[in-house]
């Protein structure tokens, strides 16, 4: 009886894994980023350190905005070092982003990834532990000495620390690699600094990727990210002007006000919602042909081969290419003619870039 029960449980687990694999395999690449965690073991997420425990923790620290290829180089080293000492990989990151606390008046923070997106990308990387530490005004006042002694050593019991080429931490970012080497000797943990990851002789950084996105250079941005840039939002009601010219659009309100929005223009995108994916053309801008308010930015997408009301739906926009700048046309008919050309160009792009 016990053997029969064991066989049934084993068959059910195996069937579930096969289902997950088939499901993920059937999705386009950009959707697999948010589905692959079905087949990965889930990361253990910690929002405080009171009950944190890991075997021989191998740790890295940072904001990891974008979880781009430079970050993934660090995460890969994290896995290797954890394996070498029979340890577990740990990423220590922050919420909110430190700049929102130490420089709240700047108001120009633009993130490549929301916290939810970042968690999913970390899960995709297969790490063991993710610490999302509350970045408070009090925490920001910790000196680098206090942070190492109280947090890295006193609470996490770090055995190996992996840092990037430009890593600095602590109050006013005064802690650097030379200081960490002294701490490693004092507190008996190992440390390694990784070289910068280059692409086309330029270093990969979150700043470089943000600049590329603002300029509409998604070839550079997506290459550096290692995946297609995504924007999540909710479909809200608009003025329904698109229907009058046979190009109905879904108006999007971004899910996170700190998420970077590409510059004004027309883009080739894929649209994901309700486990479906569509091609589409997206306009970001002030809609100067039909709107006199130049300060109002709208995000609206015309979804190809789709015409249903989806108000309130959560939607994912995946960016492939910037087609052109936003323009003001002399009439709605001229706008309609240009949109028809845009659609033809985008369909051609997707046909030639499968």
State what each model feature region is:
Residues 7, 15-17:
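Short hydrophobic targeting helices and cationic amphipathic motifs
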Residues 184-283:
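Glycine-rich, Lys/Arg-enriched anion-binding loops that position phosphate/diphosphate groups
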Residues 238-354:
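Phosphate/ribose-recognition catalytic cores of enzymes acting on nucleotide-derived substrates
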Residues 51-109, 114:
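N-terminal catalytic cores of NTP/NDP-binding nucleotidyl/phosphoryl-transfer enzymes
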Residues 33-57:
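Positively charged, low-complexity intrinsically disordered leader regions
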Residues 100-165, 169-187:
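N-terminal Rossmann-like or analogous alpha/beta NTP/dinucleotide-binding catalytic cores
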Residues 68, 122, 161, 221, ...:
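Residue-level signal for inorganic ion chemistry
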């Amino acid at each position: 009886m016990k053997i029969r029960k064991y066989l049934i449980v084993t068959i059910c687990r195996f069937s579930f894994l096969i289902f997950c694999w088939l499901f993920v395999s059937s999705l386009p690449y950009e959707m697999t980023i948010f589905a692959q965690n079905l087949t990965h073991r889930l990361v253990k997420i910690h929002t405080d350190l009171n009950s944190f425990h890991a075997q021989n923790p191998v740790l890295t620290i940072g904001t990891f905005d974008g979880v781009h290829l430079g970050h993934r180089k660090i995460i890969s080293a994290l896995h290797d070092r954890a394996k070498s000492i029979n340890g577990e990989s740990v990423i220590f990151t922050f919420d909110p982003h430190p700049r929102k606390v130490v420089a709240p008046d700047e108001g120009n923070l633009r993130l490549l990834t929301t916290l939810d997106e970042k968690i999913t990308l970390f899960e995709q990387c297969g790490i063991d532990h993710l610490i999302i530490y509350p970045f408070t005004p009090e925490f920001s006042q910790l000196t680098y000495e206090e942070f190492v002694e109280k947090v890295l050593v006193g609470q996490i019991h770090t055995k190996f620390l992996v840092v990037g080429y430009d890593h600095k931490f602590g109050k006013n970012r005064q802690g650097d690699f030379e200081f960490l080497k002294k701490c490693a000797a004092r507190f008996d943990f190992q440390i390694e600094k990784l070289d910068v990851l280059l692409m086309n002789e330029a270093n990969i950084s979150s700043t470089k990727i943000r600049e590329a996105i603002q300029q509409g250079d998604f070839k550079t941005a997506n290459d550096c990210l290692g995946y297609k840039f995504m924007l999540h939002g909710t479909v809200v009601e608009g003025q329904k002007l698109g229907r009058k010219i046979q190009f109905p659009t879904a108006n999007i309100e971004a899910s996170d006000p700190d998420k970077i929005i590409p510059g004004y223009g027309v883009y080739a995108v894929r649209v994901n919602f309700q486990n479906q994916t569509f091609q589409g053309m997206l306009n970001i801008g002030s809609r100067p042909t039909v709107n006199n308010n130049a300060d109002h930015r709208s995000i609206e997408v015309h979804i190809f081969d789709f015409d249903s009301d989806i108000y309130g739906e959560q939607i994912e926009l995946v960016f492939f290419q910037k087609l052109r700048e936003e323009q003001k046309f002399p009439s709605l008919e001229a706008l309609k003619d240009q949109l028809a050309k845009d659609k033809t160009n985008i369909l051609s792009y997707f046909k030639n870039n499968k």
